[in-house]
Amino acid sequence: MEERKPRAKKNGITRERVIECAFDELKENGWECWNARQIARRAGCSTMPIFRLFGSMDELKKEVIARALKVYEEYIYGGMREEKPYKGTGRAYIRFAKEQPRLFKALCVTEEFTGQSFAAIDPTIGRVMREAEKAGDVRGENVKRLHACMTIFVHGAGVMAASGSHLVPDDDICDLLMSDVFQALKAYYKLPQKKRESLAEEEKGETTE
C-alpha cells in the first residue's frame, strides 16, 4: 500500500505549498534569510505545519534544492539548443547568474546551503562534458582540463553578473571573450603532450628570471 505523505489541513497548508514558499523565499532573498519563520510568514501560517509536514528543515531544504536545480537545468539545456551547444551552455550559465542571482549564489557560489560542491550535484555535467569533447575535438584528460579552464572563465563572469558588478562586459563582448578563450584552449590542448610540457617549462623559466 502506497504511503501517504502527511498533510497539514489547517489553513490548507500542504507540502507543495510549503515547498513553493520555501523556494520563493530562496529565490527572492537568498539562503541567508532562509528559515522556518520567514517561510511560515510567506505561507500565512505558523512554523508548526512546516515541521509537521517535513520533520526538519534539512528535509525541506532537499526539496528546495531539487527545485532550484530544475530551474538551472532549464537554462543549461536551453543553451544546448543553440547552434553551438557548448558555447551555449556558457552563455546560459552567465544568463542564469544574471537573471537568478540568489539561486546562482545558493547553488554555485557557496556550499553552505547545499552542503556540497556544485560539481557534485550538477545534473547537467555529463551532457556538458560531451558537448565540450565535440566542440574542442579533444579527448580524455584534455577535455577535462579544457572544460575546467572554461569553467573558471564562465564562473567568474557569472559571479560578477550575479553581484551586479559594473565590470561585467555586455553580452556581445562577453560572447567574443568566451570564443577567444575557447579557441586558445582548444588550440593548446590539441598540441602534442611534449610540446605542451615544453611550453610549460618555458613559462617557468620566464617567471623565475
What are these regions (language model features)?
Residues 1-13, 189-209:
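N-terminal intrinsically disordered/low-complexity leader segments
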Residues 88, 111-140, 144-149, 175-186:
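Amphipathic alpha-helical packing segments from all-alpha helical-bundle domains
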Residues 1-29, 37-38, 59-62:
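Basic, helix-initiating cap at the start of DNA-binding domains
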